[in-house]
């Protein structure tokens, strides 16, 4: 298409926009009356205008635009319409691009064949019309010769070829045939390929969209400008988006007169302009410098922060992300508790924040005591440790004298404030708190054996001639100074050993709990029976002390009842009686835990001592001092004569009964 095609009433006007956007007046008759009467012409024009006004909707459209009907149609409407036109049984999934291309090619070929056939028909019709026209003209000429008057002049009353109705009817098909021939030739000249049509369509759509966008922007600008003077008119044409972001009457236009400046004023304005630019540059320079300093300080602080973490945190420490409730920032948390090692202590979660100090030069640990409460590493109630003191009874008096006290841990006397020291202190404090918690829990089961809980931080163990006190005290300057000033006592070493033993037994308790967690079938192993019993802390120490007292008492009874009376008799003692029936686990980790727990079997096992009394010519007497709960005493007694015959085998739980029966045996069998 060259853009200069003439107007064709059959084809319409070649436009590239939607015809609904414009209003085209209906074309009037292009022919005039042959008589040239102006009154008749005016009357005909009036009649045509009235008919056009009444039948505007029934007139044939000047423009053929199928895009008007299908271009703006949504897919949910277009797809059913297309399937309906293609016939029943057609599925949209069966329509492919290749199928559509084949249909388009077949349609184009059929159209070209039809056009050729119509052209042949038009040629034959034109030839027939020419022959008819020639015949009619010849007849008219012959008639004109025949209609001459007597003088030989032609009669003017005879109608001419142009004014003859017959000739006019014959000429109209000739004009229609010529128009059809021109239309066919025009269609052949204006035919384009599918690719060219798509390209033209794409360009037209781009230009239309651009024109619509520009017109919309222009309308928005004019509406906003109009709203300052005519609010209702401006708001009615404004889009909802513009109403939301730009209030009405926010744009105005004024006519400002342009004053012509002289050279001096131009120079002044130029200097002011450069001054403002210079001031803006100075402000930018100052802001950039400030932000650079802030960023440099932040980078330096971050560098020191991560360097200290790298220097003080090892691969054994557990780090994780958490939120600092004081600052609201995401930071690192460290787990200093012993939950992963087998601890069941839940009063303190053992979690602390790694927070940089205000100066940013050092890190500090902020432990989280419970949910929502953050407590710093300042000396306070959270710093507590267990102290062991031994009180010895004064002879012939009811008063007790302090004879021993556990020493203060060197970690508490250190003044170092680095992260390693802080982590070590936090672990020490939480370990001491859990130790006191377990001591109080176990003391409730040992009340019949002289163990009592005086308050929430003190457990007292009473023996025959001494008292052992376990107390959780706060770490303050007074306690520290008292430890440094007090002189050494007799039982200080014993108090330290008791405290160390309690710490080691608590570690063994951790290992037992960890063994239970790692063992998939804890009831299938023989060692699970021993690991599943009550936890042993005070019970083990108290049992050893009481067992030693019981052993001394039995030796005294045997010495008075037999050894002093039978000088040749000999008593031997065996205390190293431990049995290890635990089968080694095939799991490497479980086997390691079993070996570590087995190191404490001697103190964790029930105390037992065997006595063998050999009496010449009378046989032997076997005694076994045992316990069922670490604290009580059960005596097994068996007498075997010279002939290896067991005379009796009995058991006692009271020492008075044992002493009486031993005297009876001596009088009946050993004299």
From Swiss-Prot:
Q: Which residues cross the membrane?
A: none
Superkingdom in the source lineage: Eukaryota
Q: Which GO terms describe its molecular function?
A: transcription coregulator activity
State if Transcription regulation is listed as a keyword: yes
Record Pfam families: Med17
Q: Where is region (Disordered) located?
A: 104-188
GO term, biological process aspect, one? regulation of transcription by RNA polymerase II
Q: Is the keyword Ribonucleoprotein in the record?
A: no
What is the annotated localization of this protein? Nucleus
Gene3D superfamilies of this UniProt entry? 6.10.250.2620
| Annotated keywords | Activator, Nucleus, Transcription, Transcription regulation
Protein task: Component of the Mediator complex, a coactivator involved in the regulated transcription of nearly all RNA polymerase II-dependent genes. Mediator functions as a bridge to convey information from gene-specific regulatory proteins to the basal RNA polymerase II transcription machinery. Mediator is recruited to promoters by direct interactions with regulatory proteins and serves as a scaffold for the assembly of a functional preinitiation complex with RNA polymerase II and the general transcription factors.
Identify its protein family.
Answer: Belongs to the Mediator complex subunit 17 family.
Protein name per Swiss-Prot or TrEMBL: Mediator of RNA polymerase II transcription subunit 17
Q: Which organism is it from?
A: Kluyveromyces lactis (strain ATCC 8585 / CBS 2359 / DSM 70799 / NBRC 1267 / NRRL Y-1140 / WM37) (Yeast)
């Amino acid at each position: 298409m060259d853009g200069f095609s003439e107007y064709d009433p059959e084809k319409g006007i070649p436009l590239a926009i939607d015809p609904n956007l414009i209003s085209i007046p209906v074309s009037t008759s292009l022919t005039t009356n042959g008589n040239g009467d102006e009154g008749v012409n005016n009357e005909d024009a009036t009649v045509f205008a009235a008919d056009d006004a009444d039948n505007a909707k029934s007139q044939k459209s000047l423009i053929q635009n199928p895009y008007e009907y299908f271009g703006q149609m949504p897919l949910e409407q277009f797809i059913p319409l297309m399937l309906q036109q293609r016939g029943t049984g057609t599925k949209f999934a069966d329509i492919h691009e290749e199928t559509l291309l084949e249909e388009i090619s077949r349609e184009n070929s059929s159209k070209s064949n039809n056009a050729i056939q119509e052209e042949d028909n038009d040629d034959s019709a034109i030839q027939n019309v020419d022959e008819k026209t020639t015949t009619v003209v010849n007849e008219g000429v012959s008639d004109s010769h025949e209609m001459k008057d007597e003088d030989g002049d032609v009669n003017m009353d005879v109608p001419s070829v142009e004014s003859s109705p017959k000739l006019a009817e014959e000429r109209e098909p000739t004009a229609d045939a010529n128009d059809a021939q021109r239309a066919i030739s025009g269609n052949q000249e204006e035919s384009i390929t599918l690719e060219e049509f798509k390209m033209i369509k794409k360009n037209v759509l781009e230009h239309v969209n651009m024109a619509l966008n520009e017109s919309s922007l222009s309308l928005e600008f004019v509406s906003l400008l109009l709203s300052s003077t005519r609010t209702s008119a401006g708001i009615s044409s404004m889009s909802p988006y513009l109403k939301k972001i730009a209030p009405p009457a926010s744009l105005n236009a004024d006519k400002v007169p342009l004053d012509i400046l002289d050279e001096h004023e131009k120079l002044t304005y130029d200097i002011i302009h450069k001054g403002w630019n210079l001031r803006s540059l100075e402000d930018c320079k100052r802001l950039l410098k400030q932000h650079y300093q802030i960023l440099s300080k932040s980078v330096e602080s971050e560098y020191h922060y991560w360097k200290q973490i790298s220097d003080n945190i090892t691969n054994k420490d557990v780090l994780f992300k958490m939120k600092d409730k004081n600052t609201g920032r995401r930071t690192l948390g460290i787990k200093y508790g012993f939950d992963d090692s087998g601890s069941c202590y839940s009063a303190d979660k053992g979690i602390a924040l790694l927070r940089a100090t205000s100066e940013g030069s050092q890190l500090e640990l902020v432990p989280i005591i419970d949910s929502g409460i953050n407590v710093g590493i300042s000396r306070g109630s959270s710093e507590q440790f267990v102290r062991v003191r031994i009180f010895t009874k004064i002879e012939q008096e009811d008063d007790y004298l302090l004879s021993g006290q556990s020493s203060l841990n060197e970690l508490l006397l250190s003044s170092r404030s680095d992260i390693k020291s802080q982590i070590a202190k936090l672990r020490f404090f939480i370990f001491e708190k859990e130790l006191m918690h377990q001591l109080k829990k176990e003391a409730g089961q040992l009340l019949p054996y002289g163990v009592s809980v005086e308050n929430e931080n003190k457990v007292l163990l009473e023996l025959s001639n001494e008292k052992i006190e376990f107390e959780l005290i706060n770490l303050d300057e007074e306690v520290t100074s008292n430890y440094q000033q007090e002189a050494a006592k007799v039982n200080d070493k014993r108090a330290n050993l008791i405290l160390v033993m309690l710490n080691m037994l608590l570690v063994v308790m951790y290992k037992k709990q960890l063994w239970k967690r790692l063992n998939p079938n804890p009831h299938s192993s023989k060692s699970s029976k021993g690991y599943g019993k009550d936890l042993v802390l005070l019970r083990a120490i108290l049992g050893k002390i009481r067992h030693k007292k019981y052993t001394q008492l039995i030796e005294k009874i045997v010495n008075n009842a037999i050894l002093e009376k039978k000088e040749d008799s000999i008593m031997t003692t065996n205390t190293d009686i431990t049995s290890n029936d635990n089968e080694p686990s095939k799991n490497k980790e479980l086997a390691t835990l079993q070996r570590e727990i087995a190191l404490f079997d001697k103190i964790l096992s029930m105390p037992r001592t065997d006595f063998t009394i050999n009496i010449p010519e009378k046989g032997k007497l076997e005694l076994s001092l045992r316990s069922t709960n670490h604290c009580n005493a059960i005596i097994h007694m068996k007498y075997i004569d010279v002939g290896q015959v067991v005379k009796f085998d009995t058991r006692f739980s009271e020492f008075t009964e044992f002493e009486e029966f031993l005297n009876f045996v001596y009088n009946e069998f050993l004299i």
